[in-house]
Amino acid sequence: MQHGGPALDGSRMTQEQIVQLLPTREGHFIFESGHHGQFWLDLERLFLHPERVRPLAEELAGRLRDHQIEAICGPLIEGAFVGLMVASALRLPFSYSAPVRDDRATGLFPISYPIPEALRSELRGKRVAVVNDIINAGSAVRGTLASLKRCGAQPVVIGTLAVYGDAACELATTHDVALETLASFASRIWEPSVCPLCAKGVPLHA
């Protein structure tokens, strides 16, 4: 689940396709990363009609082709679905990472994204694209990048249908990888201690 706001750039048609697939709700929300924000997308609805996502996944595959990647890795849940479509379009091996919550964690990013042990040897030494559905705070991509490096893979590019805010660019810079996205939207997230919605007393959505 993620969130978004007004469109900034990219193909207008692609922007509109994504907005139609994932209408935005406004309110006060807490996200997987632990950040707070004002907009929410029900990502569970993204693959309600897979045929609507496939052209976007194929467009993303075309952008990733030039990065000489040898495998695709997508974080469960919806990111892995996009990754599987991209891997199929490029005829590349596909792997995934799965969310695991650390109940002892008290700060941001309490969820890690390990790669199943049976898949790690298939990724070792390979140039890998991390493919996701939507990136906002970047919890899933952040965790997947860390897991790929631990198993000896070489992440070279992040691919996503859309980014919300600046976190995706910051992740790409931090990990020295490229970023390919079909659309970009304005969005702001806050740590709980500085959330202006909390300061105004706006209740969190359940």
Region roles according to the model:
Residues 79-83, 165-168:
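Short, well-ordered alpha-helical microsegments
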Residues 2-68, 206:
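Active-site-facing substrate-recognition patch
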Residues 69-76, 159:
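Short glycine-rich phosphate-binding loop at a beta-alpha junction
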Residues 64, 86-87, 148, 172:
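A generic structural signal for well-ordered alpha-helical segments
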Residues 64, 78, 96-97:
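Glycine/small-residue-rich loop that forms an oxyanion/phosphate-binding "nest" at active or ligand-binding sites
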Residues 83-129, 136-142, 197:
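Short, glycine/charge-rich flexible loops or terminal/linker lids adjacent to PRPP-binding catalytic cores
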Residues 2-21, 145-206:
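PRPP-dependent phosphoribosyltransferase catalytic core
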Residues 70, 126, 156:
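Conserved acidic residues
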